[in-house]
Each structure stands twice: as structure tokens, then as C-alpha cells.
Amino acid sequence: MSALTIYSDKDASQPQWHSTDAAEIAQQLNAKGVRFERWVADRDLGQAPAPETVITAYQHAIDKLVAEKGYQSWDVISLRADNPQKEALRAKFLNEHTHGEDEVRFFVEGAGLFCLHIGDQVYQVLCEKNDLISVPAGTPHWFDMGSEPNFTAIRIFDNPEGWVAQFTGDAIADAYPRLL
């Protein structure tokens, strides 16, 4: 179930707000310029689908985003618990970073935790299958795939080079709850 938990960026011990209601989540995030919507991820992708299979199955969703914002490229990230690089990938994404473009993800399987450092608050957004999130360019954030990752998401980019991060060097992510 999708969820949003908001913390002070000075105190990770006590949430200020929490909801699993998609409309409430969208309202809170939209007020900060973050797009959050529930889309439909209902295609049967089979076991361990190839990226091309995922792209073909959801080309209509990609086309919608391209028409809206003029995005130039897309790919698929899919990680499972048996991936030998899961620990290194998790560590990389857990470092707070920004992008020079929006970070757009459409979750078609599984779940992951986006953590957004906006002003003096941290917004932890548990995204799951059917969730579309677009984090505005320049927003400090990190992503937690969990110790046993299980997700497939379509990534949409302005930059034809794909995922390019600028790490902030802030260790804030270490203080906040992680996805198990």
C-alpha cells in the first residue's frame, strides 16, 4: 500500500504526518511540486521480464508522459533479491543526491521508498505498483529499494544519457527509517 510519512529534517524519531490514502498523499506532495498519481499497471509481464517487454507493455503510459513534458528517453530498472549487486546499488541510491532534471518513475511491479528532503522536512514516499512519481529537478532525495529488492519501474528522462546524479555529501539519509 502506498504511504507518505513526513518528518522534520532535524528529528527522524517522530513522524509529523502519515497517510496511506492516495488522494491525501497526492495533495501533500503536489503542494511541494511533486507529482504523485495512481496509474494502472495491469499488464502480465511474466517472470523476470526483459526491459523491452516492459516498455512495449506500457508504451501508452510512456507516450502520455512524452506528450505532456517532452521527455527524450526512458528505460527500465528491475531489481530482485537475488541480484548479486543489490547491496552496492542500494548503497549508491541511499546517498542524498539531486538531478538536473525531473526524476520520473512509474512502478509496474513491487515497491520502493523515495525520500525527499524539501525545506526543513523529509517526505518518505512508499511507492508501489501503480504509482507514478515525478520529483522536480534540483530536489535533494534518496531512494531505498530495501535489503531484499523486488520492483520494476519505468524511468523517464529529459537527458538522453539517462540517470545522472549530483551527490550532496549530506549524510541525512542515515538518520531516517529504511525499507526492510
UniProtKB/Swiss-Prot annotation:
Q: Where is this site: May play a role in transmitting local conformational changes?
A: D102
Q: Which reaction does it catalyse?
A: 1,2-dihydroxy-5-(methylsulfanyl)pent-1-en-3-one + O2 = 3-(methylsulfanyl)propanoate + CO + formate + 2 H(+); 1,2-dihydroxy-5-(methylsulfanyl)pent-1-en-3-one + O2 = 4-methylsulfanyl-2-oxobutanoate + formate + 2 H(+)
Top-down, what is the taxonomic lineage of the species of origin? Bacteria, Pseudomonadati, Pseudomonadota, Gammaproteobacteria, Enterobacterales
Enzyme class label: oxidoreductase
According to the record, cofactor stoichiometry and binding are noted as: Binds 1 Fe(2+) cation per monomer. Binds 1 nickel ion per monomer.
Q: Which GO biological process entries does UniProt record here?
A: L-methionine salvage from methylthioadenosine; L-methionine salvage from S-adenosylmethionine
Organism of provenance: Citrobacter koseri (strain ATCC BAA-895 / CDC 4225-83 / SGSC4696)
Cross-referenced CDD domains = cupin_ARD
Q: Which family does it belong to?
A: Belongs to the acireductone dioxygenase (ARD) family.
Cofactor section: Fe(2+); Ni(2+)
Q: In which pathway does it act?
A: Amino-acid biosynthesis; L-methionine biosynthesis via salvage pathway; L-methionine from S-methyl-5-thio-alpha-D-ribose 1-phosphate: step 5/6
Query: According to UniProt, where does the site described as Important to generate the dianion lie?
Result: R105
Record Pfam families: ARD (PF03079)
Instruction: Spell out the protein name for this chain.
Output: Acireductone dioxygenase
**Documented EC number(s):** 1.13.11.54, 1.13.11.53
Site entry (May play a role in metal incorporation in vivo), positions: E96
